């Protein structure tokens, strides 16, 4: 079952400090101690408020791109889906999140080698996953 939560129509703007200095995930490097700008995640993740929804991921078919069960996806129903996009698709009345393949033939590719690529006869795209949030520390 797909659990959909509409994005706030008029979200409260919460701008937090954005450090332009990148933080390496490899060898340590001194990071700047000051913020260069501000960032509001609503502005960053949501392109069209009226057509954007939050959808909670279930399962592990997309683990190889860092999308795990329980993660929150930001999905835009109005965005046109292109080859390679991560999409929410409907197949036989069931929803799934997969990578959209348009060539050589339309299909839905899991991002986990334990799941096969699906080539449905009737493929309905519900929306394009614009971003997702993965908590690194517990809690809903």
Which residues make up each language-model segment?
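Structural motif
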Residues: 70-71, 85
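Short, positionally conserved secondary-structure boundary motifs
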Residues: 1-63, 83, 94-95, 102-106, ...
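Flexible, small-/acidic-enriched active-site or ligand-binding loops
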Residues: 112-118
